[in-house]
């Protein structure tokens, strides 16, 4: 069985964060948009669960392409780096839209932006075997449901997914006290990080 770190990285990649888009001029397919949006809630839960353990945060200057070159105030589109797992911040732009690997901002000075993004996860903190198993199974079933587009498979996968997601929520709630205790301990030891 995969380690929690491998599972977390695989899950982030599977859930629409790395759709097959290699050319910024290629339109993002509707299916990619739906796929990314469908997993948004689960993705947020996964990211929230592992956020304290994200590592390898990169800052990257990205050049973009104006959507309307004739308009100096045109929105600009950018393509996230291939290694980007999770976009944390676009400097100076609170109003931006993500479509798979494509980022669209209303206006970018000098047609360039700086991204802060997570390149990898090295430690996922507190995990449980039950979480590993149910989450990997849920992802597998959801991927089958989405990719096959078979009505029966969809219904079966969705039922199973909802059941496993409920179990995930229960496990997450159960571990809340442990996580809080762990967080407080880390804060208390902050002056001496090497002891952690």
What do the predicted segments below correspond to?
Residues 20-25, 68-73, 106-111:
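Intrinsically disordered, low-complexity coil segments
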Residues 32-102, 127-143, 147:
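Divalent metal-cofactor coordination and adjacent catalytic microenvironments
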Residues 7, 91-196:
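Internal mixed-charge
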Residues 27-46, 153-170:
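Short secondary-structure subsegments characteristic of cysteine-rich extracellular domains
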Residues 1-24, 195-196:
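Short, intrinsically disordered N-terminal pre-domain segments
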């Amino acid at each position: 069985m995969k380690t929690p770190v491998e599972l977390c990285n695989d899950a982030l990649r599977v859930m629409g964060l790395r759709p097959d888009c290699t050319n910024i001029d290629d339109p993002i397919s509707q299916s990619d948009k739906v796929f990314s949006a469908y997993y948004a809630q689960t993705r947020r839960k996964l990211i929230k669960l592992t956020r304290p353990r994200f590592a390898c945060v990169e800052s990257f200057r990205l050049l973009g392409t104006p959507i309307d070159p004739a308009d100096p105030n045109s929105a600009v589109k950018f393509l996230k780096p291939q290694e980007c797992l999770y976009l944390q911040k676009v400097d100076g732009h609170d109003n931006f839209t993500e479509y798979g690997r494509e980022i669209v901002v209303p206006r970018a000075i000098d047609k360039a932006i700086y991204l802060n993004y997570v390149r990898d996860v090295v430690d996922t903190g507190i995990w449980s075997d039950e979480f590993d198993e149910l989450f990997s199974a849920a992802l597998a079933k959801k991927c089958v449901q989405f990719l096959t587009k078979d009505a029966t498979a969809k219904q079966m996968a969705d039922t199973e997914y909802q059941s496993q997601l409920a179990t995930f929520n229960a496990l997450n709630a159960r571990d809340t006290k442990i996580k809080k205790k762990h967080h407080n301990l880390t804060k208390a030891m902050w002056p001496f990080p090497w002891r952690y």
